[in-house]
């Protein structure tokens, strides 16, 4: 496998089907809600790394930044939370002024407004393999169904290492990947070993399917303690903290 699979079977998929995919992803899973209820606090700075259509973004508590590679999915977020009469509330700026970014970085800021009083977060188009933030920046990181889209062991490792780098020593990560046990469903087509294509409409998406031990071992190898793990929504989740 190589990164060309991601271009052909991940990026092109989300570019073509962003709006159709958006309407299928609208609920926050129970474990995500309970995790944030415990760990998210006012004054925290948090990252949704691979935020997709933003279903986990509108929250009380800390300040949230949503990062995704797909500009089409980011536009879905803007379309949902910035109504026509609230377009003035969509602004641009540079997060380097907030002393969290490594360089000048443009972003979109969705403010609270009359039609979306509960919404206030930043949106950035970026790559989870090279997060554009300073080290030890975030109190919470969400990585929900993201790293299984990276098509080589090296790239999946790099994604874990980048989250480790930008997480504060006291921070937590909630990470989900699809469970290998789902491979028996008819929508899965094996390429080889644990590499699969999954049909949505008329287009295939690429996934690497983890088993529980493999995910836990990968997290520990890359500098994390696994505080909790389990299964939810056909996925494996882990709650991570940096090893001391």
From Swiss-Prot:
Q: What's the source species for this entry?
A: Vairimorpha ceranae (strain BRL01) (Microsporidian parasite)
Supply the enzyme class, top level.
transferase
Q: Which Gene3D superfamilies is this protein grouped with?
A: Vaccinia Virus protein VP39 (3.40.50.150)
Tell me the protein family, please: Belongs to the methyltransferase superfamily.
One Pfam match, given by its short name, reads Methyltransf_11
One GO cellular-component annotation of the UniProt record comes to: nucleus
Name of this chain's protein:
Putative methyltransferase NCER_101265
Keywords in alphabetical order, please. Methyltransferase, Transferase
Task: Cite the EC number.
Answer: 2.1.1.-
């Amino acid at each position: 496998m190589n990164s060309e699979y991601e271009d052909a079977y991940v990026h092109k998929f989300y570019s073509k089907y962003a709006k159709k995919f958006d309407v299928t992803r609208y609920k926050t899973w129970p474990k995500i809600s309970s995790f944030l209820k415990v760990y998210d606090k006012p004054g925290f700075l948090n990252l949704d790394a691979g935020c997709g259509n933003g279903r986990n973004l509108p929250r009380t508590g800390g300040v949230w930044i949503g990062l995704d590679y797909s500009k089409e999915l980011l536009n879905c977020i803007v379309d949902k939370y910035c109504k026509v009469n609230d377009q003035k509330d969509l602004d641009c700026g540079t997060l380097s002024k907030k002393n969290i970014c490594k360089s000048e970085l443009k972003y979109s800021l969705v403010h609270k407004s009359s039609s979306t009083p509960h919404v206030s977060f930043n949106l950035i188009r970026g790559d989870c393999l090279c997060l554009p933030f300073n080290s030890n920046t975030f109190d919470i990181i969400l990585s929900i169904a993201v790293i299984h889209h990276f098509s080589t062991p090296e790239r999946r490792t790099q994604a874990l290492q980048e989250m480790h780098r930008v997480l504060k020593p006291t921070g937590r990560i909630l990470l989900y990947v699809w469970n290998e046990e789902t491979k028996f469903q008819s929508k899965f087509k094996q390429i080889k070993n644990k590499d699969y294509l999954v049909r949505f409409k008329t287009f295939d998406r690429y996934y690497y399917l983890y088993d529980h031990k493999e995910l836990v071992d990968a997290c520990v190898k890359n500098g994390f303690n696994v505080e909790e793990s389990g299964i939810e929504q056909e996925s494996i989740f882990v709650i991570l903290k940096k090893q001391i």
